[in-house]
From Swiss-Prot:
Ranges annotated as biased composition (Low complexity): 465-481
One Pfam family it belongs to: Arrestin_C
Subunit structure: Interacts with hulA.
GO molecular function terms noted in the UniProt entry: protein-macromolecule adaptor activity; ubiquitin protein ligase binding
Stated role: Component of the regulatory network controlling carbon source utilization through ubiquitination and deubiquitination involving creA, creB, creC, creD and acrB. May be involved in signaling by recognizing appropriately phosphorylated substrates via its arrestin domains and then recruit a HECT-type ubiquitin ligase such as hulA, leading to ubiquitination of the substrate, providing a link between ubiquitination and phosphorylation in protein regulation and stability.
GO biological process terms on file: regulation of protein ubiquitination; ubiquitin-dependent endocytosis
GO cellular component: cytosol; plasma membrane
Gene behind the chain: creD
SMART domains recorded: Arrestin_C
Bias (Basic and acidic residues): 443-455, 482-492
Protein origin, superkingdom: Eukaryota
Family under the similarity heading: Belongs to the arrestin family.
Protein name as it appears in the record: Probable HECT-type ubiquitin ligase-interacting protein creD
Protein backbone atom coordinates (compact mmCIF):
# COMPACT_ATOMS: atom_id res chain seq x y z
CA UNK A 1 0.00 0.00 0.00
CA UNK A 2 2.75 2.42 0.92
CA UNK A 3 4.65 1.97 -2.36
CA UNK A 4 1.61 3.11 -4.33
CA UNK A 5 2.22 6.64 -3.07
CA UNK A 6 5.67 6.88 -4.70
CA UNK A 7 6.12 9.33 -7.54
CA UNK A 8 8.73 8.28 -10.06
CA UNK A 9 12.36 7.35 -9.43
CA UNK A 10 12.18 5.15 -6.33
CA UNK A 11 12.02 1.46 -7.16
CA UNK A 12 11.01 -1.34 -4.79
CA UNK A 13 14.58 -2.63 -4.65
CA UNK A 14 15.81 0.69 -3.27
CA UNK A 15 12.94 1.32 -0.80
CA UNK A 16 11.12 -1.83 0.11
CA UNK A 17 8.78 -0.06 2.53
CA UNK A 18 8.22 3.63 3.27
CA UNK A 19 5.17 4.83 5.20
CA UNK A 20 3.82 7.22 7.85
CA UNK A 21 2.26 5.48 10.83
CA UNK A 22 0.25 7.51 13.37
CA UNK A 23 -0.45 6.38 16.92
CA UNK A 24 -4.00 7.73 16.56
CA UNK A 25 -5.95 7.88 13.32
CA UNK A 26 -7.29 11.35 14.11
CA UNK A 27 -6.95 14.20 16.58
CA UNK A 28 -9.94 15.02 18.78
CA UNK A 29 -10.61 18.43 20.34
CA UNK A 30 -13.45 18.54 22.88
CA UNK A 31 -15.18 21.90 23.02
CA UNK A 32 -14.96 25.14 21.06
CA UNK A 33 -11.81 26.85 19.88
CA UNK A 34 -11.71 29.05 22.96
CA UNK A 35 -12.11 26.26 25.52
CA UNK A 36 -10.64 23.06 24.06
CA UNK A 37 -7.43 21.66 25.54
CA UNK A 38 -4.34 20.87 23.51
CA UNK A 39 -3.89 17.46 21.88
CA UNK A 40 -0.79 15.30 21.43
CA UNK A 41 0.11 14.02 17.98
CA UNK A 42 2.68 11.25 17.71
CA UNK A 43 3.75 8.66 15.18
CA UNK A 44 6.65 7.09 13.32
CA UNK A 45 8.16 7.32 9.88
CA UNK A 46 9.10 3.80 8.79
CA UNK A 47 11.70 2.97 6.14
CA UNK A 48 12.85 -0.47 5.03
CA UNK A 49 15.81 -0.80 2.62
CA UNK A 50 16.88 -4.03 0.97
CA UNK A 51 20.09 -2.44 -0.36
CA UNK A 52 22.07 0.76 0.33
CA UNK A 53 20.46 4.01 -0.79
CA UNK A 54 22.06 7.37 -1.53
CA UNK A 55 19.98 10.23 -0.12
CA UNK A 56 20.18 13.99 0.30
CA UNK A 57 17.69 14.21 3.17
CA UNK A 58 14.72 12.57 4.87
CA UNK A 59 12.00 15.03 5.88
CA UNK A 60 8.42 15.00 7.10
CA UNK A 61 6.01 17.90 6.53
CA UNK A 62 2.61 18.59 8.08
CA UNK A 63 0.61 21.24 6.22
CA UNK A 64 -2.87 22.65 6.85
CA UNK A 65 -4.66 24.33 3.94
CA UNK A 66 -7.88 26.36 3.96
CA UNK A 67 -9.73 26.98 0.71
CA UNK A 68 -12.95 28.96 0.18
CA UNK A 69 -14.53 28.94 -3.27
CA UNK A 70 -17.92 29.36 -4.91
CA UNK A 71 -19.34 29.60 -8.42
CA UNK A 72 -22.03 32.08 -9.35
CA UNK A 73 -24.60 30.79 -11.87
CA UNK A 74 -24.37 32.09 -15.40
CA UNK A 75 -27.81 33.70 -15.21
CA UNK A 76 -26.76 35.99 -12.35
CA UNK A 77 -25.14 39.39 -12.63
CA UNK A 78 -21.69 37.85 -12.23
CA UNK A 79 -22.12 35.75 -15.36
CA UNK A 80 -20.63 32.51 -13.98
CA UNK A 81 -17.79 34.23 -12.11
CA UNK A 82 -15.68 32.11 -9.74
CA UNK A 83 -14.40 33.47 -6.43
CA UNK A 84 -11.84 31.62 -4.36
CA UNK A 85 -8.99 31.99 -1.90
CA UNK A 86 -6.51 29.41 -0.61
CA UNK A 87 -4.23 29.86 2.40
CA UNK A 88 -1.75 27.78 4.39
CA UNK A 89 -2.97 27.82 8.00
CA UNK A 90 -0.40 25.46 9.54
CA UNK A 91 3.12 24.20 8.77
CA UNK A 92 5.53 21.91 10.60
CA UNK A 93 8.69 20.16 9.32
CA UNK A 94 10.80 17.38 10.86
CA UNK A 95 14.31 16.79 9.46
CA UNK A 96 15.47 13.28 10.29
CA UNK A 97 18.45 13.06 7.91
CA UNK A 98 20.25 16.10 6.47
CA UNK A 99 23.95 15.74 5.54
CA UNK A 100 24.14 19.36 4.49
CA UNK A 101 23.68 21.52 1.44
CA UNK A 102 24.86 19.77 -1.69
CA UNK A 103 25.98 16.65 0.19
CA UNK A 104 24.69 13.09 0.08
CA UNK A 105 24.62 10.19 2.50
CA UNK A 106 24.58 6.42 1.96
CA UNK A 107 21.98 4.61 4.04
CA UNK A 108 22.89 0.93 4.57
CA UNK A 109 20.27 -1.72 4.03
CA UNK A 110 18.02 -2.31 7.01
CA UNK A 111 14.97 -1.06 8.84
CA UNK A 112 14.72 2.57 10.01
CA UNK A 113 12.23 4.12 12.36
CA UNK A 114 11.98 7.88 12.96
CA UNK A 115 9.55 8.87 15.73
CA UNK A 116 7.91 12.29 15.81
CA UNK A 117 5.51 14.05 18.15
CA UNK A 118 3.78 17.40 18.30
CA UNK A 119 1.43 19.31 20.60
CA UNK A 120 -1.48 20.84 18.68
CA UNK A 121 -3.20 23.86 20.21
CA UNK A 122 -6.89 23.55 21.01
CA UNK A 123 -7.81 26.53 18.83
CA UNK A 124 -6.70 24.89 15.57
CA UNK A 125 -9.39 24.76 12.88
CA UNK A 126 -11.05 21.38 12.45
CA UNK A 127 -11.03 19.42 9.23
CA UNK A 128 -13.88 20.29 6.85
CA UNK A 129 -14.22 17.92 3.92
CA UNK A 130 -17.14 17.09 1.68
CA UNK A 131 -17.65 20.16 -0.52
CA UNK A 132 -16.03 20.22 -3.93
CA UNK A 133 -14.05 23.48 -3.76
CA UNK A 134 -14.31 24.53 -0.10
CA UNK A 135 -12.38 22.64 2.56
CA UNK A 136 -9.87 22.65 5.41
CA UNK A 137 -7.46 19.72 5.18
CA UNK A 138 -4.27 18.55 6.86
CA UNK A 139 -1.72 16.40 5.01
CA UNK A 140 1.50 14.64 5.94
CA UNK A 141 4.17 14.49 3.28
CA UNK A 142 7.31 12.39 3.80
CA UNK A 143 10.09 12.64 1.25
CA UNK A 144 13.47 11.05 0.65
CA UNK A 145 15.57 13.48 -1.37
CA UNK A 146 17.86 11.92 -3.98
CA UNK A 147 20.55 13.60 -6.08
CA UNK A 148 20.36 11.85 -9.43
CA UNK A 149 16.84 10.45 -9.27
CA UNK A 150 13.34 11.53 -8.42
CA UNK A 151 12.45 11.94 -4.79
CA UNK A 152 10.53 9.19 -3.02
CA UNK A 153 7.35 10.72 -1.60
CA UNK A 154 4.53 9.30 0.50
CA UNK A 155 1.47 11.21 1.72
CA UNK A 156 -1.05 10.62 4.47
CA UNK A 157 -4.08 12.70 5.48
CA UNK A 158 -4.71 13.80 9.05
CA UNK A 159 -8.23 14.43 10.28
CA UNK A 160 -8.84 16.85 13.14
CA UNK A 161 -12.25 16.38 14.77
CA UNK A 162 -13.89 18.95 17.01
CA UNK A 163 -16.61 17.30 19.04
CA UNK A 164 -18.82 18.34 21.93
CA UNK A 165 -17.93 17.89 25.56
CA UNK A 166 -20.07 15.41 27.51
CA UNK A 167 -21.31 18.32 29.63
CA UNK A 168 -22.33 20.47 26.64
CA UNK A 169 -25.80 21.96 26.88
CA UNK A 170 -26.63 20.79 23.36
CA UNK A 171 -26.54 17.20 24.65
CA UNK A 172 -28.79 17.84 27.64
CA UNK A 173 -31.45 20.28 26.47
CA UNK A 174 -34.40 19.19 24.39
CA UNK A 175 -35.62 21.43 21.58
CA UNK A 176 -39.34 21.96 21.08
CA UNK A 177 -41.85 24.28 19.48
CA UNK A 178 -45.31 24.41 21.03
CA UNK A 179 -48.27 26.63 20.32
CA UNK A 180 -52.01 26.80 19.76
CA UNK A 181 -53.58 27.80 16.48
CA UNK A 182 -56.93 29.17 17.67
CA UNK A 183 -59.90 27.16 16.46
CA UNK A 184 -57.50 24.95 14.50
CA UNK A 185 -54.99 22.79 16.32
CA UNK A 186 -52.78 22.52 19.38
CA UNK A 187 -49.35 21.17 18.46
CA UNK A 188 -46.00 20.26 19.98
CA UNK A 189 -42.95 19.20 17.93
CA UNK A 190 -39.73 18.34 19.78
CA UNK A 191 -36.38 16.55 19.59
CA UNK A 192 -34.71 14.91 22.63
CA UNK A 193 -31.47 16.90 22.18
CA UNK A 194 -30.24 19.69 19.98
CA UNK A 195 -26.98 17.89 19.14
CA UNK A 196 -27.02 14.88 16.80
CA UNK A 197 -24.13 12.56 15.93
CA UNK A 198 -23.16 12.47 12.28
CA UNK A 199 -24.29 9.25 10.62
CA UNK A 200 -27.04 8.44 13.14
CA UNK A 201 -30.71 9.48 13.12
CA UNK A 202 -32.85 12.31 14.49
CA UNK A 203 -35.92 11.44 16.52
CA UNK A 204 -38.79 13.89 16.19
CA UNK A 205 -41.78 13.67 18.56
CA UNK A 206 -45.15 15.00 17.38
CA UNK A 207 -48.21 15.82 19.45
CA UNK A 208 -51.20 17.12 17.47
CA UNK A 209 -54.62 17.86 19.02
CA UNK A 210 -57.35 19.18 16.66
CA UNK A 211 -59.51 21.92 18.17
CA UNK A 212 -62.07 22.13 15.35
CA UNK A 213 -64.66 19.43 14.85
CA UNK A 214 -64.23 17.82 11.46
CA UNK A 215 -60.60 18.97 11.06
CA UNK A 216 -58.33 16.22 9.73
CA UNK A 217 -54.55 16.12 9.43
CA UNK A 218 -53.08 15.51 6.00
CA UNK A 219 -49.47 15.01 4.91
CA UNK A 220 -46.65 15.73 7.39
CA UNK A 221 -43.32 16.72 5.80
CA UNK A 222 -40.02 16.93 7.71
CA UNK A 223 -36.87 18.32 6.09
CA UNK A 224 -33.28 18.77 7.22
CA UNK A 225 -31.82 21.93 5.69
CA UNK A 226 -28.09 22.72 5.58
CA UNK A 227 -26.94 26.33 5.10
CA UNK A 228 -23.48 27.49 3.99
CA UNK A 229 -22.09 30.97 4.69
CA UNK A 230 -18.74 31.43 2.93
CA UNK A 231 -16.43 34.41 3.37
CA UNK A 232 -13.24 35.02 1.42
CA UNK A 233 -11.64 37.37 3.95
CA UNK A 234 -13.01 36.57 7.42
CA UNK A 235 -10.42 38.82 9.11
CA UNK A 236 -11.37 41.80 6.91
CA UNK A 237 -14.06 44.06 8.46
CA UNK A 238 -15.32 44.87 4.94
CA UNK A 239 -15.68 41.20 4.00
CA UNK A 240 -19.45 41.52 3.75
CA UNK A 241 -18.93 42.23 0.05
CA UNK A 242 -17.13 38.90 -0.43
CA UNK A 243 -19.66 36.48 1.05
CA UNK A 244 -21.79 33.78 -0.44
CA UNK A 245 -24.80 31.97 1.04
CA UNK A 246 -26.29 28.72 -0.11
CA UNK A 247 -28.68 26.07 1.23
CA UNK A 248 -29.36 22.46 0.36
CA UNK A 249 -31.84 19.84 1.52
CA UNK A 250 -30.14 16.94 3.27
CA UNK A 251 -33.18 14.69 3.71
CA UNK A 252 -36.92 14.76 3.18
CA UNK A 253 -39.47 12.68 5.11
CA UNK A 254 -43.17 12.51 4.17
CA UNK A 255 -45.74 10.82 6.39
CA UNK A 256 -49.52 10.49 6.59
CA UNK A 257 -51.49 9.47 9.65
CA UNK A 258 -53.76 6.47 9.90
CA UNK A 259 -56.85 8.28 11.12
CA UNK A 260 -58.62 5.06 12.08
CA UNK A 261 -55.97 3.73 14.46
CA UNK A 262 -53.74 6.69 15.41
CA UNK A 263 -56.28 8.68 17.42
CA UNK A 264 -55.71 8.42 21.18
CA UNK A 265 -56.34 10.20 24.47
CA UNK A 266 -53.45 12.59 25.24
CA UNK A 267 -52.72 13.70 28.82
CA UNK A 268 -56.17 12.44 29.86
CA UNK A 269 -57.62 15.66 28.50
CA UNK A 270 -58.29 15.54 24.77
CA UNK A 271 -58.17 13.29 21.74
CA UNK A 272 -55.23 13.73 19.41
CA UNK A 273 -52.28 12.15 17.66
CA UNK A 274 -48.97 11.40 19.33
CA UNK A 275 -46.15 9.67 17.41
CA UNK A 276 -42.42 9.82 16.59
CA UNK A 277 -40.46 9.88 13.35
CA UNK A 278 -36.81 8.87 12.85
CA UNK A 279 -34.85 10.77 10.22
CA UNK A 280 -31.75 8.85 9.12
CA UNK A 281 -28.74 11.04 8.37
CA UNK A 282 -26.41 10.35 5.41
CA UNK A 283 -23.29 8.27 6.05
CA UNK A 284 -20.94 10.41 3.97
CA UNK A 285 -19.65 13.95 4.41
CA UNK A 286 -20.23 14.71 0.75
CA UNK A 287 -23.98 14.79 1.45
CA UNK A 288 -23.99 16.23 4.96
CA UNK A 289 -21.36 18.29 6.79
CA UNK A 290 -20.92 18.86 10.49
CA UNK A 291 -21.81 22.19 12.12
CA UNK A 292 -18.79 24.49 12.10
CA UNK A 293 -17.73 28.12 11.99
CA UNK A 294 -14.03 28.63 11.28
CA UNK A 295 -11.79 30.33 8.70
CA UNK A 296 -14.68 31.82 6.74
CA UNK A 297 -16.65 28.56 6.53
CA UNK A 298 -19.91 28.47 8.48
CA UNK A 299 -22.27 25.49 8.32
CA UNK A 300 -25.60 25.27 10.18
CA UNK A 301 -28.59 22.88 10.16
CA UNK A 302 -32.28 23.18 10.95
CA UNK A 303 -35.41 21.06 10.75
CA UNK A 304 -38.43 22.35 8.85
CA UNK A 305 -41.91 20.92 9.30
CA UNK A 306 -45.09 21.32 7.27
CA UNK A 307 -48.39 19.87 8.46
CA UNK A 308 -51.43 20.00 6.20
CA UNK A 309 -54.78 20.70 7.89
CA UNK A 310 -57.97 19.68 6.05
CA UNK A 311 -60.74 22.05 7.19
CA UNK A 312 -64.41 20.98 7.24
CA UNK A 313 -65.29 23.58 4.58
CA UNK A 314 -62.84 21.98 2.13
CA UNK A 315 -59.91 24.41 2.04
CA UNK A 316 -56.41 23.35 3.16
CA UNK A 317 -54.34 25.13 5.79
CA UNK A 318 -50.67 24.48 6.48
CA UNK A 319 -48.86 24.54 9.80
CA UNK A 320 -45.15 25.42 9.55
CA UNK A 321 -42.48 25.13 12.24
CA UNK A 322 -38.68 25.14 12.49
CA UNK A 323 -36.25 23.62 15.00
CA UNK A 324 -32.47 24.13 15.09
CA UNK A 325 -30.19 21.09 15.29
CA UNK A 326 -26.43 20.73 15.61
CA UNK A 327 -24.59 17.87 13.88
CA UNK A 328 -21.18 16.87 15.22
CA UNK A 329 -18.70 14.10 14.45
CA UNK A 330 -18.19 11.45 17.11
CA UNK A 331 -14.74 9.89 17.58
CA UNK A 332 -16.49 6.54 18.03
CA UNK A 333 -17.61 6.50 14.38
CA UNK A 334 -14.50 6.30 12.20
CA UNK A 335 -14.44 8.08 8.83
CA UNK A 336 -12.21 6.83 6.04
CA UNK A 337 -10.12 8.82 3.56
CA UNK A 338 -13.10 9.07 1.19
CA UNK A 339 -15.19 10.82 3.89
CA UNK A 340 -17.47 7.83 4.42
CA UNK A 341 -18.30 6.07 7.67
CA UNK A 342 -16.25 2.90 8.04
CA UNK A 343 -19.00 1.03 9.88
CA UNK A 344 -22.44 1.99 8.59
CA UNK A 345 -24.49 -0.61 10.46
CA UNK A 346 -27.31 0.53 12.79
CA UNK A 347 -25.55 -1.21 15.68
CA UNK A 348 -22.48 1.02 15.39
CA UNK A 349 -24.64 4.15 15.34
CA UNK A 350 -26.47 2.99 18.45
CA UNK A 351 -23.18 2.28 20.23
CA UNK A 352 -21.99 5.81 19.48
CA UNK A 353 -25.21 7.25 20.90
CA UNK A 354 -24.89 5.15 24.04
CA UNK A 355 -21.26 6.15 24.54
CA UNK A 356 -22.15 9.83 24.43
CA UNK A 357 -25.11 9.34 26.77
CA UNK A 358 -23.07 7.41 29.32
CA UNK A 359 -20.02 9.67 29.39
CA UNK A 360 -19.71 11.67 32.60
CA UNK A 361 -16.98 14.31 32.93
CA UNK A 362 -14.15 13.96 33.55
CA UNK A 363 -13.47 11.31 30.92
CA UNK A 364 -11.16 8.51 32.01
CA UNK A 365 -9.08 8.77 28.86
CA UNK A 366 -8.09 12.33 29.73
CA UNK A 367 -6.90 11.40 33.24
CA UNK A 368 -4.89 8.22 32.74
CA UNK A 369 -1.74 9.71 34.26
CA UNK A 370 -3.30 11.59 37.17
CA UNK A 371 -1.84 10.97 40.62
CA UNK A 372 -3.62 8.25 42.54
CA UNK A 373 -5.49 9.13 45.70
CA UNK A 374 -3.38 6.68 47.73
CA UNK A 375 -0.29 8.68 46.81
CA UNK A 376 -1.63 12.02 48.02
CA UNK A 377 -0.48 13.63 51.24
CA UNK A 378 -3.59 13.88 53.45
CA UNK A 379 -2.35 17.12 55.04
CA UNK A 380 -4.48 19.95 53.77
CA UNK A 381 -7.15 17.68 52.25
CA UNK A 382 -8.77 16.19 55.35
CA UNK A 383 -10.61 18.53 57.65
CA UNK A 384 -10.27 18.93 60.52
CA UNK A 385 -6.57 18.11 60.27
CA UNK A 386 -4.46 16.51 63.01
CA UNK A 387 -3.40 19.93 64.30
CA UNK A 388 -6.88 21.42 64.34
CA UNK A 389 -9.11 21.71 67.36
CA UNK A 390 -12.20 19.54 67.67
CA UNK A 391 -14.59 22.44 68.23
CA UNK A 392 -15.46 25.87 66.95
CA UNK A 393 -12.99 28.81 67.17
CA UNK A 394 -12.42 30.40 70.57
CA UNK A 395 -13.60 33.75 71.76
CA UNK A 396 -10.97 35.87 70.06
CA UNK A 397 -12.23 34.67 66.68
CA UNK A 398 -15.94 34.83 67.45
CA UNK A 399 -18.50 37.55 68.01
CA UNK A 400 -20.51 35.68 70.62
CA UNK A 401 -18.65 37.52 73.44
CA UNK A 402 -20.77 40.60 72.89
CA UNK A 403 -22.24 41.47 76.29
CA UNK A 404 -25.61 42.57 75.05
CA UNK A 405 -28.30 43.82 77.40
CA UNK A 406 -29.64 40.34 78.09
CA UNK A 407 -31.25 41.58 81.29
CA UNK A 408 -33.96 43.24 79.21
CA UNK A 409 -35.11 39.78 78.12
CA UNK A 410 -35.90 38.69 81.68
CA UNK A 411 -39.43 40.01 81.50
CA UNK A 412 -40.16 38.08 78.28
CA UNK A 413 -38.73 34.66 79.09
CA UNK A 414 -40.98 31.85 80.23
CA UNK A 415 -38.23 29.56 81.48
CA UNK A 416 -36.67 29.19 84.90
CA UNK A 417 -33.31 30.55 83.72
CA UNK A 418 -33.04 34.31 83.37
CA UNK A 419 -31.12 35.96 80.56
CA UNK A 420 -28.77 37.68 83.00
CA UNK A 421 -27.97 34.32 84.59
CA UNK A 422 -27.17 32.88 81.18
CA UNK A 423 -24.88 35.81 80.40
CA UNK A 424 -23.13 35.45 83.74
CA UNK A 425 -22.50 31.74 83.22
CA UNK A 426 -21.15 32.32 79.72
CA UNK A 427 -18.79 34.92 81.12
CA UNK A 428 -17.62 32.50 83.81
CA UNK A 429 -17.01 29.85 81.15
CA UNK A 430 -14.90 32.26 79.09
CA UNK A 431 -12.91 33.22 82.17
CA UNK A 432 -12.30 29.54 82.88
CA UNK A 433 -10.87 29.01 79.39
CA UNK A 434 -8.60 32.03 79.72
CA UNK A 435 -6.97 30.72 82.88
CA UNK A 436 -6.50 27.14 81.68
CA UNK A 437 -2.71 26.87 82.31
CA UNK A 438 -3.25 27.48 86.05
CA UNK A 439 -6.17 27.72 88.46
CA UNK A 440 -5.93 31.03 90.36
CA UNK A 441 -8.29 32.07 93.08
CA UNK A 442 -11.35 34.17 92.25
CA UNK A 443 -9.72 37.19 93.88
CA UNK A 444 -6.64 36.91 91.67
CA UNK A 445 -8.79 36.57 88.57
CA UNK A 446 -10.90 39.61 89.45
CA UNK A 447 -7.88 41.75 90.17
CA UNK A 448 -6.34 40.63 86.84
CA UNK A 449 -9.44 41.77 84.93
CA UNK A 450 -9.54 45.05 86.85
CA UNK A 451 -5.92 45.77 86.04
CA UNK A 452 -6.62 45.01 82.37
CA UNK A 453 -9.59 47.39 82.39
CA UNK A 454 -7.52 50.14 84.01
CA UNK A 455 -4.73 49.68 81.45
CA UNK A 456 -7.23 50.14 78.62
CA UNK A 457 -8.94 53.07 80.32
CA UNK A 458 -12.27 51.26 80.79
CA UNK A 459 -14.16 51.14 84.12
CA UNK A 460 -14.52 47.79 85.77
CA UNK A 461 -18.34 47.84 85.62
CA UNK A 462 -18.61 49.26 82.10
CA UNK A 463 -19.51 45.89 80.53
CA UNK A 464 -21.54 44.53 83.43
CA UNK A 465 -25.34 44.44 83.53
CA UNK A 466 -27.31 46.99 85.49
CA UNK A 467 -27.71 46.70 89.21
CA UNK A 468 -30.18 44.12 90.32
CA UNK A 469 -30.01 42.06 87.14
CA UNK A 470 -27.47 39.61 88.51
CA UNK A 471 -29.84 38.05 91.00
CA UNK A 472 -29.98 34.36 90.18
CA UNK A 473 -29.60 31.13 92.03
CA UNK A 474 -26.00 29.88 92.29
CA UNK A 475 -27.23 26.31 92.13
CA UNK A 476 -28.65 26.65 88.61
CA UNK A 477 -27.13 24.34 86.03
CA UNK A 478 -24.30 25.79 83.97
CA UNK A 479 -25.17 26.46 80.32
CA UNK A 480 -22.78 27.00 77.43
CA UNK A 481 -22.95 28.04 73.80
CA UNK A 482 -19.83 26.01 72.92
CA UNK A 483 -19.87 22.33 71.93
CA UNK A 484 -19.44 19.80 74.68
CA UNK A 485 -16.03 18.73 73.38
CA UNK A 486 -14.74 22.28 73.76
CA UNK A 487 -15.85 23.01 77.30
CA UNK A 488 -13.38 20.81 79.13
CA UNK A 489 -9.95 21.35 77.60
CA UNK A 490 -8.17 19.75 80.52
CA UNK A 491 -8.83 16.28 79.07
CA UNK A 492 -7.91 17.13 75.46
CA UNK A 493 -4.60 15.54 74.41
CA UNK A 494 -1.72 17.82 73.60
CA UNK A 495 -1.74 19.02 70.00
CA UNK A 496 -5.47 18.35 69.49
CA UNK A 497 -6.74 21.79 70.47
CA UNK A 498 -6.23 25.20 68.91
CA UNK A 499 -3.36 26.97 70.74
CA UNK A 500 -4.24 29.95 72.90
CA UNK A 501 -2.96 33.35 71.88
CA UNK A 502 -1.01 35.44 74.39
CA UNK A 503 -3.20 38.48 73.70
CA UNK A 504 -6.43 36.54 74.29
CA UNK A 505 -7.53 38.46 77.40
CA UNK A 506 -6.79 41.83 75.86
CA UNK A 507 -8.60 41.08 72.61
CA UNK A 508 -11.55 39.66 74.53
CA UNK A 509 -11.85 42.83 76.58
CA UNK A 510 -11.61 45.06 73.52
CA UNK A 511 -14.21 43.05 71.62
CA UNK A 512 -16.87 43.23 74.31
CA UNK A 513 -19.80 45.58 73.81
CA UNK A 514 -21.37 47.55 76.70
CA UNK A 515 -25.01 47.13 77.57
CA UNK A 516 -27.58 49.61 76.35
CA UNK A 517 -28.17 51.18 79.78
CA UNK A 518 -24.44 51.71 80.25
CA UNK A 519 -23.92 53.15 76.78
CA UNK A 520 -26.63 55.80 77.15
CA UNK A 521 -25.04 57.04 80.39
CA UNK A 522 -21.73 57.71 78.67
CA UNK A 523 -20.92 61.23 77.49
CA UNK A 524 -20.81 61.44 73.71
CA UNK A 525 -17.49 62.63 72.34
CA UNK A 526 -17.75 65.76 70.17
CA UNK A 527 -17.37 65.13 66.45
CA UNK A 528 -14.45 67.55 66.19
CA UNK A 529 -12.37 65.81 68.85
CA UNK A 530 -9.08 64.38 67.57
CA UNK A 531 -7.45 61.12 68.48
CA UNK A 532 -5.19 61.25 71.57
CA UNK A 533 -1.50 61.84 70.93
CA UNK A 534 1.36 59.69 72.17
CA UNK A 535 1.91 61.67 75.38
CA UNK A 536 -1.74 61.34 76.38
CA UNK A 537 -1.67 57.60 75.88
CA UNK A 538 1.54 57.22 77.91
CA UNK A 539 0.07 59.37 80.69
CA UNK A 540 -2.94 57.07 80.94
CA UNK A 541 -0.65 54.10 81.64
CA UNK A 542 0.83 55.83 84.72
CA UNK A 543 -1.00 54.72 87.90
CA UNK A 544 -3.10 57.54 89.30
CA UNK A 545 -3.57 57.72 93.08
CA UNK A 546 -7.17 57.25 94.11
CA UNK A 547 -8.93 60.61 94.46
CA UNK A 548 -11.08 61.54 97.38
CA UNK A 549 -14.50 60.04 96.91
CA UNK A 550 -17.73 61.50 98.15
CA UNK A 551 -20.47 59.35 99.68
CA UNK A 552 -22.69 60.08 96.63
CA UNK A 553 -20.09 58.65 94.26
CA UNK A 554 -19.67 55.57 96.43
CA UNK A 555 -23.45 55.22 96.52
CA UNK A 556 -23.77 55.49 92.74
CA UNK A 557 -21.13 52.81 92.12
CA UNK A 558 -22.26 49.19 91.69
CA UNK A 559 -23.03 47.72 95.10
CA UNK A 560 -21.27 44.48 94.17
CA UNK A 561 -17.86 46.25 93.94
CA UNK A 562 -15.62 46.99 96.91
CA UNK A 563 -14.83 50.55 97.97
CA UNK A 564 -11.13 49.93 97.37
CA UNK A 565 -11.51 49.91 93.55
CA UNK A 566 -10.00 52.78 91.57
CA UNK A 567 -12.07 55.30 89.60
CA UNK A 568 -10.93 56.05 86.05
CA UNK A 569 -11.75 59.14 84.08
CA UNK A 570 -14.72 57.37 82.51
CA UNK A 571 -16.20 56.72 85.99
CA UNK A 572 -16.29 60.44 86.71
CA UNK A 573 -18.00 61.11 83.38
CA UNK A 574 -20.83 58.83 84.45
CA UNK A 575 -21.80 61.18 87.31
CA UNK A 576 -21.78 64.55 85.60
CA UNK A 577 -24.89 66.62 86.46
CA UNK A 578 -26.04 66.72 82.83
CA UNK A 579 -26.65 62.95 82.61
CA UNK A 580 -29.71 61.73 84.44
CA UNK A 581 -30.22 58.31 82.83
CA UNK A 582 -29.04 56.49 85.94
CA UNK A 583 -31.94 58.04 87.92
CA UNK A 584 -34.70 57.13 85.44
CA UNK A 585 -37.81 55.55 86.84
CA UNK A 586 -38.70 51.89 86.51
CA UNK A 587 -41.39 52.86 83.98
CA UNK A 588 -38.76 54.38 81.68
CA UNK A 589 -36.62 51.27 82.03
CA UNK A 590 -39.51 49.06 80.95
CA UNK A 591 -40.19 51.30 77.91
CA UNK A 592 -36.52 51.21 76.98
CA UNK A 593 -36.44 47.43 77.22
CA UNK A 594 -39.57 47.13 75.10
CA UNK A 595 -38.07 49.38 72.40
CA UNK A 596 -34.88 47.33 72.43
CA UNK A 597 -36.80 44.07 71.98
CA UNK A 598 -38.82 45.59 69.11
CA UNK A 599 -35.64 46.82 67.42
CA UNK A 600 -34.07 43.38 67.66
CA UNK A 601 -37.18 41.77 66.24
CA UNK A 602 -37.00 44.08 63.20
CA UNK A 603 -33.36 43.13 62.62
Amino acid sequence: MALSFFSGGGSASHAKYFDIRLDEDYIVFRGGEQEAASAHLSGKLLLCLSEPLSIKHIRLHLTGISRVCWHLPSSSAGGGRKSWRERVIYEKTWRFRDPGKGKTEILPAGNYEYPFNLVLEGNMPESIEGLSDTYITYRFKAEIGRKYAKDIIVRKPLRIIRTLEPSALELAHAMSVENIWPNKIEYSISTPTKAVIFGTSIRVDFKLIPLLKGLTIGQIVSQLIESHDLTLNPEDPDSIRNTYKNTRTILNDEFELDHDNALEIIDEAAEGYQFSRYLDLPKTLTRCLQDTDTKGIKVRHKLKFRVQLMNPDGHISELRATLPVSIFISPNLAIDENNNLVDQTPQSAQRAINDIAQQAPPLYGEHQFDQLYSELDPNGYRTPGPGSGPGTPFGTLSRNLSAENLASMNALTNTDISASALHSRLSNLSNLNITRPHQPSPTDHESQNDSEHRRLGVPADYFGPSSGSNSHSPSSPVLSRRPSDEVDHEHVPSGMATPFHPQYAEVETLSRVPSYSTAVRTTVRPHDSDLPDYDAVVAEDIPVPPPLQSPQQAHIRNAGRGSSQLFSSLDILHHRPGLGHSHSSSHDDEDRRLRLVQARARV
